[in-house]
Swiss-Prot record:
This is Olfactory receptor 8G3. The lineage of its organism: Eukaryota, Metazoa, Chordata, Craniata, Vertebrata. Glycans are attached at residue 5. The gene is OR8G3. The chain crosses the membrane at residues 26-46, 55-75, 100-120, 140-160, 198-217, 238-258, 272-292. The keyword Phosphoprotein does not apply. PROSITE patterns: G_PROTEIN_RECEP_F1_2 (PS50262).
């Protein structure tokens, strides 16, 4: 289709989660609450780990990095969504849309690989405790984290670069609550075959590979837990692992539903619901899941509260 026969989209309207006016206030209050919990929880976790010397270990180094990613991941999307709920205008400019897509993709990809790094760290700690300090040295942790962000930036740059090559002119309504890949591809007047192929290939690498790493790590971890003779110790370990596995399953399951299938397979409304989980729910839950059953975190909180009171 010749781009010269069409006017390009310079400003778009985000369809949002619901078009019903009576739901906008309720959705605003719901997501405002989620946003506050997410920001407080993740920034609180980063601050707590930074201030507590006994938490300066590889496990908490990765947890701090995950909290930073979750904070950024959420704030790229939620503030704009809240403004749209409040004003009911839902307008986003083309540069703002591309910037949101680029930043969102960085942190979404980075989160996949950070969760895999954390699972590997847990595997080494439980299955090879004598070699833990050698394998998970500060040097290795640093470069693992750098690698996570490099993969995020590389994947996001590829997606956004190919998106910028498309001529968006079909409509100015984006059937989503933020600028994501498949909703934007639906606006294109030119062929999206390469873009959709890239989404499937890169999603397979950035979702399936980390998911398989996590699965393998937890298989070995569970096998080690089963060898624990103490019933109390075994149940405690299973309780902790089950909460971690649940958070990971929700994140990767919803992300896979969104990206690991062609755009024609499921409706955009189904994809909207799925994306709520990995863009807002999981970033809110992660600090709670990784801290509620953690004695080290509870001890650090008590110490800081005691120092503040004194």
């Amino acid at each position: 289709m010749d781009p010269g026969n069409h006017s390009s989209v310079t400003e778009s309207i985000l369809a949002g989660l619901s078009e019903q006016p009576e739901l906008q206030l309720r959705l605003f209050l719901l997501f405002l609450g989620i946003c506050v919990v997410t920001v407080v929880g993740n920034l609180g976790m980063i601050t707590l780990i930074g201030l507590s010397s006994h938490l300066h270990t590889p496990m908490y180094y990765f947890l701090s990095s995950l909290s930073f990613i979750d904070f950024c991941h959420s704030t790229v999307i939620t503030p704009k969504m809240l403004v749209n709920f409040a004003t009911e205008k839902n307008i986003i400019s083309y540069p703002e849309c591309m910037a949101q897509l680029y930043l969102f993709s960085i942190f979404a990809i980075a989160e996949c690989h950070m969760l895999a790094a954390m699972a590997y760290d847990c595997y080494v700690a439980i299955c090879s405790p004598l070699l833990y300090n050698v394998i998970m040295s500060y040097h290795h942790c640093f470069w693992l984290t750098v690698g996570v962000y490099i993969l995020g930036i590389l994947g996001s740059t590829i997606h956004t670069s190919f998106m910028l090559r498309l001529f968006l002119c079909k409509t100015n309504v984006i059937n989503h609550y933020f600028c994501d890949l498949f909703p934007l591809l639906g606006l294109s007047c030119s062929s999206t075959y390469i873009n959709e192929l890239l989404v499937l290939v890169l999603s397979a690498f950035n979702i399936l590979m980390p998911a398989l790493t996590i699965l393998a790590s937890y298989i070995f971890i569970i096998a080690s837990i089963l060898r624990i003779h103490s019933t109390e110790g075994r149940s405690k370990a299973f309780s902790t692992c089950s909460s971690h596995i649940l958070a990971v399953a929700v994140f990767f399951g919803s992300a896979a539903f969104m990206y690991l299938q062609p755009s024609s397979v499921s409706s955009m409304d189904q994809r909207k619901v799925s994306s709520v989980f990995y863009t807002t729910i999981v970033p809110m839950l992660n600090p709670l899941i990784y801290s509620l059953r953690n004695k080290d975190v509870k001890l650090a909180v008590k110490k800081i509260l005691h120092q503040t009171a004194c």
